[in-house]
From Swiss-Prot:
This is Proteasomal ubiquitin receptor ADRM1. Component of the 26S proteasome, a multiprotein complex involved in the ATP-dependent degradation of ubiquitinated proteins. This complex plays a key role in the maintenance of protein homeostasis by removing misfolded or damaged proteins, which could impair cellular functions, and by removing proteins whose functions are no longer required. Therefore, the proteasome participates in numerous cellular processes, including cell cycle progression, apoptosis, or DNA damage repair. Within the complex, functions as a proteasomal ubiquitin receptor. It comes from Danio rerio. Component of the 19S proteasome regulatory particle complex. The 26S proteasome consists of a 20S core particle (CP) and two 19S regulatory subunits (RP). The keyword Chloroplast does not apply. It comes from the Eukaryota. Keywords: Cytoplasm, Nucleus, Phosphoprotein, Proteasome. Residues 191-264, 381-410 are annotated as: Disordered. One of its GO terms (cellular component) is proteasome regulatory particle, lid subcomplex. PANTHER family: ADHESION REGULATING MOLECULE 1 110 KDA CELL MEMBRANE GLYCOPROTEIN, PROTEASOMAL UBIQUITIN RECEPTOR ADRM1. Its main location: cytoplasm. PROSITE patterns: DEUBAD, PRU.
Amino acid sequence: MSSGALFPSLVSGSRSSSSKYLVEFRAGKMTLKGSTVTPDKRKGTVYIQQTDDSLIHFCWKDRTSGNVEDDLIIFPDDCEFKRVNQCTTGRVYVLKFKAGSKRLFFWMQEPKTDKDDEYCRKVNEYLNNPPMPGALGSGGGGGHELSALGEGGLQSLLGNMSHNQLMQLIGPTGLGGLGALAGPGLASLLGSGGPATSSSTSSSRSQSAAATPSSGSAARLSSTQAPTTPVTPAATSSGSPTVTPTTPAAQTPSLPAGPASSTQPIQLSDLQSILATMNVPAMPTEGSGVDLASVLTPDVMAPILANPEVQQRLLPYLPSGESLPQSAEEIQNTLTSPQFQQAMSMFSSALASGQLGPLMNQFGLPSEAVDAANKGDVEAFAKAMEGSDSKTDDGDSKDKKDDDEDMSLD
């Protein structure tokens, strides 16, 4: 359930040329083993980047090899970047996630200390208050590059999106991000239709919301002195922060979807219709609208998530990675995260608008669910999905019974 960027790979060099670093400074990684943190002596760079899909990435790369080893998608209020005052042998900073006990440590490699506080302030500012799309000048707006695709290129893009990429259209960064892009670039493209250009490949680079494992290359000594003492409770009198087993930063989960329809891809007119209303709150037709986030509360979900069968069905949709264990506890952490609750609210609003029918049809959902999505009836949509699930279970039971009968005939 990794978060794949929707558009970067479609315009040559879009991810690097159109997304400048918001802040960058030289810093090395620190390796966490148990409750001990030891410095990785390679020369590195920490930087924050806003990509064309409006997501904020916190990255660390090896300055010698140029390899980006850590690329985390960060949402506002996910984490805090601050100095570890308990460490007196070096300028150590920690990226501390608020959901769980996950911490990533770095040690400053800038030769001068006069800008340390400024770097720390900027990191927190951009992580928790990301700039609006297009606010970074000509280099930061993805809408202009979408316009360069033309109608033919964008149509090709929509037809080749994977399920996870399509799900971003109904996630917090999808609806909000595309709605914002619709202003300067995408709206003009959809309104007038730009000149068709040849489409590029549609394989998009998957960005994990967790740090990737460090490479096994030999560590290179930095010209700046590394902290000589591991950050441990025994090493300092004041004690360093105790680091417990890591948990992932909360991210927007991809909702389980049915098999992709093998018929027609999403049409450009469908996306135009969706974008036209996604930033306008839907007016309830009868009574008050249903907010799934207020219905699927942790108390309601707890007994459901305790079912081992449900857990096994949800585990494949969890993020994967060395520091991201796929367990029942992680299911609970994901579904109770603020990002998931926000995604549920956004999905409810989008579903109530009656504009998600084409997307639901693309996911291969039953006709009852598609009809409910076209009508903006959240309750009917939920019942249709529940009925579809029951039919699937009945079908599986019937198939198993037929198999048993065939075996008895043998």
